[in-house]
Structures are given as C-alpha cells and as structure tokens.
Amino acid sequence: MPERLFCQVCSAPHQYLYFNNGKERSQVRCKLCESFTPVSQRYRKPAKYFCPHCEHPLFLWKQRRSTAVYKCDRDDCSYYLANRKKLNKAERLLFLTKSSQFRLRYNYVECHFTQEELVHSAPQKKESGNIFAIRNTLHTLALILTFHISLGLSARKTAFVLRNVFGVQASYQTVLNYSEMAAYHCHKFNLAHKGEADALQVGDEAYAKVAGRNWYAFLFLSPLRRKITSYHCSPERDERAATTALREAIRTVPKNAQKVTAVTDGLSSYVPAAQYINHTENAVLSHKQVIGLQNLDTESETYRPFKQMIERLNRTFRFHTNPASGFKEANGLISITTLFATHYNFLRPHEALNFEVPCPLDQLKDIATLQGKWAKILRIAASLT
C-alpha cells in the first residue's frame, strides 16, 4: 500500500487501508470508517457549456461522428420541470418505468464540421459534358427531359417513345447519360434563378435506393410561392446533411427579415442544424417541429398545414423517381433530383398559384411547348458555366 494514501473521510493512514477492487487496484477502503478513496485523483476539466436555464454545467452525454451532445442533469432545472408538467397522466405513468423514452432535459449539440464542409450536393460533370456536342440535336435532348423528367417516364419507356413515336434512335442508356449531362448545367441554373425565399421554410426527407442502400433527399419548400429552395442528397440523415439543406433553403431569404422559421418533422438532426446556423451566421432562425399524425400540442396544430405541403411535394417527388427503381450511383439520384427541382420550379403550373409556375421567367413566357422550354433553360444554364 503506498504510504501517500490516507482515508479522505477519517484521515486514517495507509496501514488501515486495503485495495477494494481486485486487480485494478484503483480504489482503497478504510478499515475504520469503511469509506472508499480513489488511488489517483480525477483531473476535472472546466465545464465547456452551461445550461441557459439553470446555469448548471453540461456533461458530455453522447459522442458521434459529426456531433457531441451535452446534457443538463440537474433535477431542479426550470426547463426540465416545465417539460415534466406538460406530461399527461398516461405519459407520467410511462415515465416512471421508461424515462429514456422522453426528452425532457436541456441538450446542446456541438457540431464537428465547418461551414466550408457544408456543400450542397451537385451533379458531377461527365467527360463528354458538352450538351451542344452530342450526336443528337438539342431538340431531342429536350424531348428526353420532357418525357423522362416532366412526365415521369422511366428511361426505357422514354427510349421506347422516342423510337416508336418520333423515330429517334436512342437507347435507355442514352437517356440516362443525357439526363446527367443536363443536370450538371441545370443545378447552377436552379441556384441562380431561385429568387427570394419566404421567411417560412418547410422541409422533409424522401429516400431512394442507391446501390442497394438508402439515400436521402432533403427537400425544402417555400409555402407562399410553392417553390423548392433546397434539394440536398446525402447517404445519412445526420446533422451535417440537415444543416447543409437548411442553410441553402434560407440563403436567399431577404436580409431585412426579422425572423425566419423552419418547420420540419421530429427528426433530431434539425435541432442542432438550427442551433449551428444561429451560432455561426448570426441568424434569427426559429425551428418548429410537427410530431406524429395527430395534433397533440399547439405547435403541431399551428404548423401542420405547412407539413402537409411538404408531404405532397414528397409524393410528387416519388412519382418522378420511383420509375427508376433505384440507382447504381449517387450521381443518378442527385441528377434526377436536380432536374425534378428545375421542372417543379420553372415548368410545372400550380393550382394554388392560379396555374402559374412557382418561379416565372420572362425568357420562357412566349414558349408554348415543354420541350421548347427545356431547350431554352439548357441554353441559359450553359451560359452560366
């Protein structure tokens, strides 16, 4: 027994101490008062974060790849007590046995990524990416986008229509290649002509199969003009992907907007995303969550109509992506998502807008056909790159 050790309760010397935890020999026990003393003192680091409600130090609760979660464990914290009071009778009984099913304590999520890493997904440029140097005409490319994107036909059905209706010899692989070439240019067109976004944004995720595994498309919508403001694709539904999508959605919100509101479902990744944007960009972003299918709280009741808008957008998105039956590469999903956003914002009339498109352009007003509008969009997009 080291002579430097003594009981921290009754100050008994080392002769009255013995190791209490076997081979680890990291804890001793006093023979006189039977209290425990560690062999080596813990080094306590100063607290990194504090609870804004009770000013109690937060402890590291969970460590993830892109985030670290800090939690307040004080039982008399005003935030915790207020959430306890909101529980109904059934929830209080459940809380006695399954307290881990409730999120009542204050959490703070520290993000491990930088603003430079928050890059919106974009289609890759193909080696033969010049849409004006293809073997077919620009009109044929516009026809492919009309049937494959605007009408939601699969690549094989699109090739069938071209061969048997228009007499154009094109394989389904040609349809896919041309779509990816066009998506590279349309992505920059979408970002350049998105216009001002509403101070209220609503978002949700849709999934698709890429090489047999789930990928997620984070879609954000402006409820007033019904236009897509963000369409980020990611293999994970983590905080980094949610932050990237939300950051792009509010990028064109007017600077004089006093308050920006983001409405999402109960996905936990959106909470640290809103915190990160408020912290790094000095934004005034308010995050609202619509939980479940029933209005069990006032927040869900107030913002559920906006959540239903994004659900209808997801239904439309799946109509255009389901014919693909999955993708071999991520670039396929990113490309069709980009082209869908182009179609939805600039070509698809909306009943709520008196059958106008969400993002009207003067260059497209005098063009009557969809293929003509696609051709004009490609010309404008090519001039941006």
Model-derived features with residue positions:
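Active-site beta-loop-alpha junctions of metal-dependent nucleic acid enzymes
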Residues: 180-181, 231-255
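Acidic/histidine-rich, metal-coordinating catalytic segments
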Residues: 257-271, 293, 357
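Short, positively charged, Gly/Tyr-enriched micro-motifs
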Residues: 11, 34-200, 205-211
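N-terminal alpha-helical interaction blocks
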Residues: 1-29
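Short amphipathic alpha-helical "interface-anchor" segments enriched in bulky aromatics
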Residues: 302-328, 333-337
